[in-house]
């Protein structure tokens, strides 16, 4: 019984961290969370003029990603990811903003050859987060 109590007390922080919005990587989240995956697929489905690495980001993780950060948008916690094309980070990058439950996503794409576009009809507050430092 004592061993079980020790195990549970040591494991509790790990369980608490599972739901954190910071420190996650985009491909891992898309691969493991159906709401996140479906939200991204919905944004990308049928879109033309996107870099191939962005169109394929759901099935292939061949891009460079920075760990997510939690941001507050209109008082609500959201998860912000940044990623770029391997070998072309200065020329082709994205920012993705997910609701805490992963069901809503907005995406900003910046590509030197193809230009920029924002998908998902972001609110003004969401757009300001996506376009910050651009």
Residue ranges of predicted features:
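A general marker of short, structured functional hotspots
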Residues: 3, 21-23, 59
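Cleavable N-terminal signal peptides
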Residues: 3-4, 14
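Intrinsic-disorder/low-complexity peptide segments enriched for small residues
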Residues: 1-2, 8, 19, 129
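N-terminal signal peptide c-region/cleavage motif recognized by signal peptidases
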Residues: 9-13
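C-terminal partner/receptor-binding element of secreted or periplasmic proteins
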Residues: 17-41, 109-134
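Mature extracytoplasmic domains of secretory-pathway proteins
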Residues: 41-105
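An N-terminal domain-start capping segment
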Residues: 6-7, 111
């Amino acid at each position: 019984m004592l061993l079980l109590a020790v195990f549970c007390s040591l494991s509790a922080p790990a369980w608490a961290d599972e739901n954190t919005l910071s420190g996650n990587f985009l491909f891992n989240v898309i691969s493991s969370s159906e709401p996140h995956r479906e939200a991204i697929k919905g944004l990308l489905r049928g879109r033309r003029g996107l870099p191939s690495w962005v169109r394929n980001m759901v099935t292939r993780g061949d891009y460079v990603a920075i760990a997510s950060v939690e941001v507050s948008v209109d008082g609500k916690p959201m998860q912000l990811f940044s990623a770029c094309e391997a070998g072309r980070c200065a020329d082709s990058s994205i920012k993705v903003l997910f609701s805490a439950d992963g069901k809503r996503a907005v995406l900003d794409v910046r590509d030197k050859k193809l230009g920029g576009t924002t998908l998902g009809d972001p609110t003004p507050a969401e757009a300001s987060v996506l376009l910050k430092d651009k």
